[in-house]
């Protein structure tokens, strides 16, 4: 693969909308390019690992074979385990038994991956390097644990939740780590701005123990829109290539109909391939 020196890869989350990002990674593999650095949260982190392990169409096969399986996502899981998504099934049984993940290739990848999760006590993002993953992918579990739909994850002395709360589009992390030029993969169309918000009474009821977490959830839309504006400005300044869906998506975070998800994956491949030459030009600056 052709290493794009000094170009970072920045990945937002988005739940099942992350199938768009997975398609973009397929385009990168088809174009035979790789990045020395990636920073990712939530679904972006979960999907990029198959790109780093060089396993084409692996994420697509997960969708065709398992996304409709109640073990993957169901109210039963939520009632039984407190998590809508069964992360033991997703992060252990699938990669270790059902659809083997190439852990050795992942570990040997030249890409320095950092996965972000939100510290519930401080409201700040904690970054976990690729070397901390292990075969249980605990940082991925933490980064993908959505408010109200998953329990707090305890890892390395931290109480953690969805990385997209504290750092939804982690381009500032990439810049701080020395990558002034970045490819930024989003899961929302041009013109989208976040207006999400949770009732404050519900946050205080559910997360009374974590006032800093409540504050970061309450201000997430403002933070998202600020980071989105930064990404778009970097693109205008010739310091970034932004890849995102061309039209508004009807697919939400929890969408589970395979055919529509596969169409989104195809769209990601299409959008990724369309911008490969732009990415190569960015690397030559």
Where do the PLM segments sit?
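Patatin-like phospholipase
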Residues: 1-41, 49-285
